[in-house]
């Protein structure tokens, strides 16, 4: 509002509005709230600055520490700026409250205005023979003064409040705490993956569709005209009793009706369906190309990071894997003593003290050196991690069968053929028989 507008209203209006308002209490409460918020921002900024400085000073060293400090520095700066903005907002609220108090003090009060009106009424009522002309003029001049004073006070109050409103800072949103350069990388990925919508193809198709609609419209109009001509021929033939003209009119009306129906009920819906289908195909193709086009671009950095994390771990296993190349040392092992004579005699059988286990496989000559190794199955290798036995392990020389009355039974693996221990055999039914 401007001064002439304030002058357009009587002083009673301005005085009543200022006196009946909420007063400066709400502005002062808001100023106190902004001051408390400013102090809170300052405390958080100070605490975070200490943490960031401690990290950069040696608590956490290396590139990660540098990235941490670089990521939090903008947030600390925002906290400091937010504290300053909150303090400025508190000051502007206090300035607006002070302007209100000054305007209320300078504004003519309602009792003063009422007294002026009462004095004017008394002077006018007692103005016999014009004796109160000068007092009435002075009274009216005083009212004009209060009118101008009220307008001036309101103009000044408006200027103070407007300046406070303009000077109040607006704090922006807090920055996102991210790795430096991450936004540029994401923007580059988005720019590389998002392709523009094919508006050129859409414009060409719509142009072709518009031309097709125009041709269909011409077909419909020509069919309507042909139907009208055929109807005139039909009526003329009926009136003049001309059968050929009636037949011609009926034929023209028939083909015109077919053309009109074809255009309205077939071609127009087909064109509409084609337009919708083309729009759907372009939109879906654009969306799919952008979605699947982002996978290789985004997958490259992810796979690179994964490879960087896995390769050092695999390289660290090279020392352990190298132990597998150590040669296995074979130690000659004799037949366990516990196996000799460990078979108890079976009731009903005959114990042969000189019984030997007969094998279908010829044993190796005594002069031949046989490498006897422990089997590679069992409790596992003991000692160094990664040691392994040789693949050439002594094989059993045959099978031992627990015979029954029918002469067959479940096969049991024999001991390695290179051991050749003397075992106790059981003859007869239920004895041990070598096959």
From Swiss-Prot:
Q: Which family does it belong to?
A: Belongs to the mycobacterial PPE family.
Organism for this UniProt entry: Mycobacterium tuberculosis (strain ATCC 25618 / H37Rv)
**Which gene underlies this protein?**
PPE47/ppe48
Name of the featured protein: Uncharacterized PPE family protein PPE47/PPE48
GO BP, one annotated term? response to host immune response
Under SUPFAM superfamilies, the record lists:
PE/PPE dimer-like
What is its induction? Highly up-regulated during the early stages of invasion of the human blood-brain barrier.
Stored InterPro entries:
PPE-PPW_C, PPE_dom, PPE_sf
Looking up Pfam families in the UniProt record yields: PPE (PF00823), PPE-PPW (PF18878)
